[in-house]
Amino acid sequence: METIKKHYFSDIGVMLGRSMRHIFRSMDTIITVTITPIAMMLLFVYVLGGAIETGTKNYVNYLLPGILLIAIASGISYTAYRLFMDMKSGIFERFHSMPIAGSSALWGHVLTSLVSNAISVVVIILVALIMGFRSSAGILSWLAVAGILAMFTLALTWIAAIAGLSAKSVDGAGAFSYPLIFLPFISSAFVPTDSMPGPVRAFAENQPVTSIVDAIRSLLAQQPVGNDIWIALSWCLGILIFAYLFAMRVYKQKAA
């Protein structure tokens, strides 16, 4: 059993290395998913921020959590694209004929998404610091933020895996991400939900992004998190489990 586990994780490591090499050979993926959220952050802070009432003195502090989620939602679309291209090229069939763990190729793509999105998040936070972002959070709060963002990334990445495995075209593989990118705009990411019309506010307060954004914002400000963190974790974990099981089912059907 220990030998099987060792080979399984070794196979995943090889596939992760393969996918990461593709990323670093073509850095436009990370650059694209980093530059767009940064441009959005610049626009909202320096052009629109003065007209938005959030109850905080520093709008970039309020804005950053939502920008990070948008960056992640943008980044996972490339996972769907890369998976689709692997399926189309027939490389998965070649992997299945080799003495390696069957799902290691899929896990390689998922972990690559986690690493590449983590790089984007770090770059965006560094830019936010230059723009005036400040946090009083301690190491434990930062670790909690990292954990929430990692779970959010994994949850969306497994959704991306479903799209990449099921899509009939390149456009179809990436199109699923548009609603995910749009969700932060109907949440507390940019403005408090109190300012929204009734039906919009009801939707905003009961969708996953608002609780995730509020939890991260409170952690970074060293403020009481309340139930937001548990609601955020429940959303992330629920989506992660469902998407993982569905993606593995689709993968096994494709591999059969």
Q: What are the residue ranges of the model-derived segments?
A:
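Transmembrane helix segments
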Residues: 44-51, 164-206, 210
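Aromatic- and glycine-rich beta-strand/loop motifs that create alpha-glucan
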Residues: 1-36
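Short cytosolic juxtamembrane segments of multi-pass membrane proteins
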Residues: 249-256
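Transmembrane helix-loop-helix hairpins at lipid-water interfaces of multipass membrane proteins
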Residues: 35-59
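Hydrophobic alpha-helical transmembrane segments of multi-pass membrane transport proteins
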Residues: 39-44, 60-131, 178-179, 184
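Alpha-helical transmembrane segments and their short interhelical loops
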Residues: 102-177, 224-248
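Membrane-interfacial helix-loop-helix junctions in multi-pass membrane proteins
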Residues: 22, 53-54, 187-242
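Short alpha-helical transmembrane interface motifs in multi-pass membrane proteins
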Residues: 2, 25-29, 72-77, 107-112, ...
